[in-house]
Amino acid sequence: MRNIMYFGGTCQSPALPALVRPPAPPLQPSLDIKPFLPFPLDTAAAVNLFPNFNAMDPIQKAVINHTFGVPLPHRRKQIISCNICQLRFNSDSQAAAHYKGTKHAKKLKALEAMKNKQKSVTAKDSAKTTFTSITTNTINTSSDKTDGTAGTPAISTTTTVEIRKSSVMTTEITSKVEKSPTTATGNSSCPSTETEEEKAKRLLYCSLCKVAVNSASQLEAHNSGTKHKTMLEARNGSGTIKAFPRAGVKGKGPVNKGNTGLQNKTFHCEICDVHVNSETQLKQHISSRRHKDRAAGKPPKPKYSPYNKLQKTAHPLGVKLVFSKEPSKPLAPRILPNPLAAAAAAAAVAVSSPFSLRTAPAATLFQTSALPPALLRPAPGPIRTAHTPVLFAPY
């Protein structure tokens, strides 16, 4: 009995190893924990949560999309393009600005002109095909006539009627063809007889000044202007601007349609005393301020420059230097000491000799009398140390 109690006590004692102890109950894994707020990811269910989702503001839709993962409906970007100019735009305002611009209008006009040319070409081709079909019909009727003479007389009568009709058609066509060159020659003769003023009024363009206007009143105002009149005078040679043929250019040559009579000429403006080499230079000179002021009689404006020609000619002080032709007299022997007198005399002889190439020195500006010998004597006391004499010679 004691042993049983002992063993029972030993089983309950903590001295036994941990392997004998019963295992602890297993813990529940953390994966079994359910989320706190389970929201469905289905877009239809999320939209059902908000019945007015489609009527909401874009900001509210963006917030709901960010929180609940409801994707916004993708809008397809509308592509706006111009097929004529081959351009794409980002908005309607850009497209409207392009359609109102001059670049688009120019391309539209060019496209319409090409279409009109193609229509005229197709009309000419259709006219040619009809003319050729008529000629082939006449040839066929003539061949039928030759065949009908050998056949029955009824067939010959029908063919003669057809031939008469075809001959009438051919005569009408030939008359039209003959009239067309006469009308063309008449139209070509009209521009030859048309004067320059009538042509300018018809085209609203001055071929002399190369100026295009928008109305007849503007053309009259241009013709009454000074620039147009001076260009007319230059062409006629009656004004102050004279035209001369350019050297080295032949007078004979192909006459251009836009010839103004001023090509290959040089011009001289007598008012300004200016020579120009071309028509464009003449136009620039006529429109310059210098020519306008001279033509109006205004005096020329003085040119201010640091180096004026008048200042070069006239000296501001007006001092005149007098040069004497006689050789200068040698220095007095009293001024120079005795050792230097010989050198001064030799220098004077060299200056006065005819073989010397040096010119005579200029006379002094102010003639003064020689200093008296009393002033040239040394002082009574030794004021400073005496220096060696210095010789001043020209060379």
Swiss-Prot record:
This entry carries the following GO cellular component terms, namely: nucleus
The answer, when asked if Repeat is one of the entry's keywords, is yes
Q: What is this protein called?
A: Zinc finger protein 385D
Region Disordered: start and end of each range? 169-194, 282-309
- Record field: compositional bias (Polar residues): 169-193
Q: What is the lineage of its organism?
A: Eukaryota, Metazoa, Chordata, Craniata, Vertebrata
Return the InterPro entries for the record.
Matrin/U1-like-C_Znf_C2H2, Znf385, Znf_C2H2_sf, Znf_C2H2_type
Q: Where in the cell is it found?
A: Nucleus
Q: What keyword terms does UniProt attach to this protein?
A: Metal-binding, Nucleus, Repeat, Zinc, Zinc-finger
- Residue spans, zinc finger Matrin-type: 80-110, 204-234, 267-297
Q: Which organism is it from?
A: Homo sapiens
The UniProt GO MF terms for this protein read: sequence-specific double-stranded DNA binding; zinc ion binding
